[in-house]
Amino acid sequence: MDSGILLQEYIEESNGEDLRIFVVGHKVVASMKRMSTLEDFRSNVHRGGQTEKVKLSKKEESMAIDAAKHLGLGVAGIDLLRSKRGPLLLEVNASPGLRGIEAVTGINVAKEIILYVEKNFRNNKWR
């Protein structure tokens, strides 16, 4: 087999939970906790994971914003785990799905993205 392997540390204290944080224009616009089902340790909503609104710590919020900035992303879905060592960066999504986050938070994330795109296009930041 000629392919790469990615190994990832298992964070037991996360208990199959993670945080999805939507960053738009260097600010957090919405966040939710995703929880896995008994059948699957992954918390993805499209795999049946449950969601609830969550209050982020200042460290979680700044970590999400910094991750998006570091990768040059104006829109990003940042996934964090809560651990005994503090928040851990799990994944950065450059094209995050909206499934679940608007319903659980009551925030129109799509509108926030559109406003961000309009503002940056108007200011010629993409030309």
Where are these regions (language model features)?
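Protein kinase-like catalytic core scaffold
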Residues: L6, V29-A30, A76, L88-L90
